Regions:
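Structural signal for hydrophobic packing residues in well-ordered secondary-structure cores
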Residues: 23, 27, 42-45, 49, ...
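Rossmann-like NAD(P) dinucleotide-binding subdomain of oxidoreductase/dehydrogenase enzymes
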Residues: 94-233, 359
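Residue-level signal for inorganic ion chemistry
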Residues: 34, 56, 78, 138, ...
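Short acidic active-site motifs
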Residues: 11, 178-182, 364
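Conserved C-terminal structural/oligomerization subdomain of aldehyde/semialdehyde dehydrogenase
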Residues: 1-4, 278, 322, 329-482
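ALDH superfamily catalytic-core signature
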Residues: 189, 197-339, 402, 464-465, ...
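Short, well-ordered beta-strand elements within core beta-sheets of diverse protein domains
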Residues: 2-7, 21-28, 116, 223-225, ...
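N-terminal Rossmann-like NAD(P)+-binding subdomain of aldehyde/semialdehyde dehydrogenases
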Residues: 1-103
Length: 482
């Protein structure tokens, strides 16, 4: 497909300096000027979609549909922040110490140079979608894509530049983990998407410099299916939730807790639907699931399946390698009889594998869903919307989806991120653009008599102090002054 050069420490330092210089001009531009470039970029990725799709598929081995999902979400992200970004960034007025004589406002200033370290599973989407709100907020962006999939990020950046962006405002540094570590030493903010182990290292390096950061890390995401739920729809939803992008999605479902009364029926439907999925690498739209990212990752996923089977797990569907299709293909797999002692029940597999667990009640389902060091996403299917919402609110995850599985990532007006070992910070919504800014509070007082502080300094005796206390008691009872 091509090749990219590996950035040295000197290269990274020099590129960040170039970005910093360009950002000084960019931050003075209007939101409208920035938005015009992002709008052209939105239109351009749709116009060049075949080239984008071909690049994504060639780097990752994913299906055409999964590649299209990357374009759809990037376009949706652009549209959302084009429509709402200026409002999120606008000056906000707040109450100050004393009405009438004091006032307060919040202004949002760009950090400067934002660094993004992005993974291989969605190389176009994650290579550019987080950069869009950062740019609209007035930052420059330097991205370090995965060494397994650098060309999708390079293409995204090239399309941004073709849309009119100063080339020094969106730069790419290629290399391994050491490249990312060096990038953190120079930027003003770092956003990382990837595994929990590496995320901890990112947090330590960023903390040493006292720069802000966000981490979207791993997940062992649960799904709850209760009696009264639409079982056929839940099984179909799980196909997407567990096997989209060959299961290589941070928010994908890996654990399913099914109420005993409907367990057998649900398991049968899921196994039948899973066995009908079409595997392959093709530009045709009828392929349901592509390959894993590499033979090494396929080896890891297959080993995890075999380890579970050797320990007593039962395969309801899939479970096999497909060397006839290529070295990186693993069938979409449904497991039962998985015990809590098996690593596959606790550790993220990041592949097309889902395990079913019977539960006696919704209380047991909630308890087992929460029995994880991760807390990224969850899915709930119940008899009524009220019941589903009550359960969703009790699951310890950054997001919970009712009657769907991956819907959170297309819901651009709400924050998306994790709790516990699944990360810190949020993308999307107001949070997704304000994280790229520093909030500055500006408070003011009338100058008469030396200002508000001087008024307090005029308290000279107990009678004056009692008068102040009495005034505070009255103040609490006046709603518009609280």
């Amino acid at each position: 497909m091509g090749h990219v050069g590996v950035a040295t420490a000197t290269d990274i330092r020099d590129l960040v300096l170039r970005a910093r210089e360009a950002q000084q001009r960019w931050k003075r531009s209007s939101f409208g000027d920035r938005a015009r470039i992002i709008k052209r970029f939105h239109d351009l990725i749709l116009e060049r979609r075949d080239r984008v799709l071909d690049t994504i598929q060639s780097e990752t081995g994913k299906s055409r549909r999964d590649a299209l999902a990357e374009i759809v979400i990037v376009a949706g992200t652009a549209r959302y922040y084009l429509a709402n970004g200026e409002r999120h960034l606008a000056l906000k007025r707040r109450r100050a110490a004393v009405p009438l004589i004091t006032s307060a406002e919040i202004v949002y200033k760009p950090h400067g140079v934002v660094g993004l370290i992005t993974p291989w599973n969605y190389p176009f989407l994650l290579g550019i979608a987080d950069a869009l709100p950062a740019l609209l907020a007035g930052n420059a962006v330097v991205t370090k894509p995965s060494e397994l999939t650098p060309l999708s990020a390079v293409l995204a950046r090239d399309l941004l530049v073709e849309s009119g962006l100063d080339p020094n405002l969106a730069l790419i540094v290629n290399g391994s983990g050491d490249t990312g570590a060096e990038l953190i030493r120079h930027v003003d903010y770092i956003g990382f998407t990837g595994g929990t182990v590496t995320g901890r290292k990112v947090a330590i390096t960023a903390s040493e410099r006292l720069i802000p950061y966000s981490l979207e890390l791993g997940g062992k995401n649960p799904m709850v299916v209760l009696r009264g739920a639409p079982l056929a729809e839940a099984a179909t939803g799980l196909l997407a939730g567990a096997f989209s992008n060959s299961g290589q999605t941070c928010i994908s479902i890996e654990r399913v807790y099914v109420e005993e009364a409907v367990y057998d029926q649900f398991a049968k439907q899921l196994a039948e639907k899973t066995s009908r999925l079409k595997l392959g690498w093709s530009k045709a739209w009828d392929v349901d699931m592509g390959s894993l990212i590499s033979k090494a990752h396929a080896d890891k996923v297959s080993s995890r399946i075999q380890q579970a089977v050797d320990a007593g797990a039962r395969v309801l569907a899939g479970g096999k390698r497909r060397p006839d299709l290529g070295p990186s293909f693993v069938e979409p797999t449904v497991l039962t009889n998985v015990s809590d002692a098996m690593p596959i029940s606790k550790e993220e597999t990041f592949g097309p594998v889902v395990a079913l667990y019977p539960v006696r009640s919704s209380e047991e389902a909630i308890a087992r869903a929460n029995d994880s060091e991760f807390g990224l996403n969850a899915s709930v299917w119940a008899g009524t919307g009220t019941e589903a919402r009550e359960i969703a609110r009790r699951i310890d995850t950054g997001s919970a989806v009712i009657n769907s599985t991956l819907l959170i990532y297309n819901s651009f007006d709400v924050p998306q991120g994790g709790v516990k070992y699944s990360g810190i910070g949020r993308r999307h919504g107001e949070h997704g653009i304000l994280r790229y800014t520093q909030a500055q509070s500006i408070v003011s007082s009338i100058a008469s008599g030396g200002g508000f502080d001087a008024l307090l300094n005029r308290i000279r005796n107990e009678r004056m102090a009692r008068a102040v206390v009495a005034g505070l008691k009255v103040w609490r009872r006046i709603p518009w002054l609280r």
